[in-house]
Regions:
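Substrate-binding pocket helix/loop in short-chain dehydrogenase/reductase
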Residues: 100-101, 108-110
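Active-site helix of classical SDR
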Residues: 124, 160
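Conserved NAD(P)H cofactor-binding loop of Rossmann-fold oxidoreductase domains
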Residues: 92-97
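Conserved glycine-rich cofactor-binding loop
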Residues: 16-17
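Conserved glycine-rich Rossmann-like NAD(P)H-binding loop of the short-chain dehydrogenase/reductase
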Residues: 30-47
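C-terminal helical subdomain
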Residues: 177-180, 184, 201-239
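Residue(s) in the substrate-gating loop at a strand-loop-helix junction
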Residues: 144
Length: 239
């Protein structure tokens, strides 16, 4: 069977997070070249160097970006579009503010929506133009089970992920005629550093980032006409 991912360029935001790093590893194992983006420049440099040592035949580049900075995001998109035709975009970067709406500020709102919604919107908009020219593309937006459920402690996060779900649905309708598939993957809590900040649940029952990444790579690879544009992933817990 031909590997449709061989040689394709994947842009991954939040590439140094627990889930983003797992997705990067699985995609490079499939033969993808990588463009790794993180707000932690030193960390993404180290990660990219490690992958280059393991996969010297693959092209790997890394970029630091603060998604709260609109100009920085726009400059990054221009850079990505000018250098290579990326056909896979994984919007994995996110923030998880734990604060009820009553005590949230406009600054809290802006920070949450700038990272969780505006950045995926701009990146999807910018990179989709190249995907249209090529006639193939995959965009994966990392949502959350909070897209469907409210929470008294994480209201802004829930709202931002619900907005991302709506954005994904609209992009799917807009881009499907160009053979660009848009997915919103909405997992429950994951065993990452971000997941550790949620002390309301049992961390041992959280999803493992490796298994979520495996799902994501599967839907990117699946090239038949059957499609699941929304995926809700949760752990089966047997008492």
């Amino acid at each position: 069977m031909n590997n449709i991912l061989m040689g394709k360029v994947a842009v991954i935001t939040g590439a140094t997070g627990g889930l983003g790093a797992c997705i990067a590893v699985k995609l490079i194992e499939e033969g993808c070249d990588l463009r790794l983006i993180s707000s932690q420049l030193g960390k993404v440099e180290t990660f990219a160097r490690r992958l280059k040592d393991q996969y010297p035949e693959r092209s790997i580049e890394h970029y630091g970006a603060d998604f709260r900075n609109l100009v920085a995001v726009q400059d990054l998109i221009q850079l990505l579009r000018s250098k290579v035709d990326a056909t896979i975009l994984i919007n994995c970067a996110g923030v998880f503010p734990i604060k009820d709406i009553s005590h949230s500020t406009v600054a809290d709102y802006d920070h949450c929506f700038d990272v969780n919604v505006r950045a995926p919107f701009l990146l999807s908009q910018g990179l989709a133009e190249n995907m249209k020219k090529i006639g193939w593309g995959r965009i994966v937006n990392l949502g959350s089970s909070s897209s469907y459920n409210g929470s008294k402690d994480t209201g802004l996060y829930c709202a931002s992920k619900h907005a991302l779900l709506g954005l994904s649905r609209s992009l799917h309708q807009e881009l499907k005629e160009f053979n660009i598939r848009v997915f919103c993957v909405s997992p429950g809590s994951i065993q990452t550093d971000m997941g550790k900040t949620d002390t309301r649940q049992d961390f041992s029952n959280f999803l493992r980032p490796e298994e979520v990444a495996e799902y994501i790579v599967f839907i990117i690879k699946f090239d038949n006409e059957l499609i699941s544009d929304e995926l809700r992933l949760n752990r089966v817990i047997v008492q």
